[in-house]
């Protein structure tokens, strides 16, 4: 993952703020890899020295995400999930993001990587106890995420993207559903990048993703991806 190596070098030289947001080093990129090869460097690149950071869904995160996240040496890094996982350097909190157990404006930056699509759906694959399913759960979750983000703070979200579909344990977003999510957040969109898997990952347009399905185009998992960076407004009337 070349971009993560680039970020690591910036970290060691104290220059994380100048590293810049993720850009595909080549197209196609990550042939034979899942959407994680995009999401992880994209999310990590959004960190600009914030003190209090929350990662939602950390307990089931891959080591290839947790390792670079921890390498950022974030002063106060919290993890929220339905189950506990002991990770040195992360303050574990067990809870439901739809009822986040944090005060208003608690965090400078919140990361929600391939997690939002599972909220409100059948999570027994990750969590033994079945929760009540709620197709609007993601909208409730994003409102809570916005609430616990400080004004002027930022939110990073990645979700599978293409044709809207309920797969039972997660939903794939389309333009309409993602716009509803962003609207519910009440935040400003700083950046939105779309990607499609076609013998590797490439930048894509909305039109190119309209009919993309999960595991389509011989993808190992998602064949379409949306990465969004939001900012909570500084003023209540924005």
Predicted regions: what they are:
Residues 1-50:
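Class I SAM-dependent methyltransferase Rossmann-like catalytic core
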Residues 109-115, 121:
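A short beta-strand submotif of the Rossmann-like class I SAM-dependent methyltransferase core
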Residues 118-123, 134:
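A short His-aromatic
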Residues 128-154:
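A short glycine-rich, Lys/Arg-flanked "PGG" loop and its adjoining helix->strand segment in the class I
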Residues 136, 157, 162-181:
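Acceptor-substrate binding/catalytic loop of class I
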């Amino acid at each position: 993952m070349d971009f993560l190596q680039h970020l690591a070098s910036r970290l060691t030289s104290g220059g994380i703020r100048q590293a810049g947001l993720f850009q595909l080093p080549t197209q196609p990129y990550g042939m034979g890899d899942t959407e994680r090869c995009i999401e992880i460097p994209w999310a990590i690149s959004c960190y600009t020295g914030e003190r209090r950071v929350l990662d939602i869904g950390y307990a089931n995160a891959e080591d290839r995400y947790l390792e670079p996240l921890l390498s950022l040496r974030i002063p106060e890094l919290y993890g929220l999930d339905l189950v506990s996982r002991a990770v040195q350097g992360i303050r574990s909190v067990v809870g439901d993001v739809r009822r986040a157990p944090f005060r208003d404006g608690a965090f400078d930056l919140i990361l929600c990587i391939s997690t939002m699509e599972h909220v409100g759906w059948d999570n027994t694959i990750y969590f033994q106890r079945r929760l009540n399913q709620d197709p609007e759960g993601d909208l409730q979750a994003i409102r809570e995420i916005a609430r616990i983000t400080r004004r002027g703070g930022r939110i990073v979200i990645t979700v599978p993207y293409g044709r809207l579909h309920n797969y039972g344990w997660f939903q794939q977003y389309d333009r309409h559903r993602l716009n509803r999510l962003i609207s519910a957040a009440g935040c400003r969109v700083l950046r939105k990048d779309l990607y499609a898997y076609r013998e590797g990952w490439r930048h894509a347009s909305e039109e190119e993703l309209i009919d993309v399905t999960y595991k389509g185009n011989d993808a190992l998992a998602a064949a379409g991806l949306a990465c969004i960076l939001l900012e909570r407004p500084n003023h209540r009337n924005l």
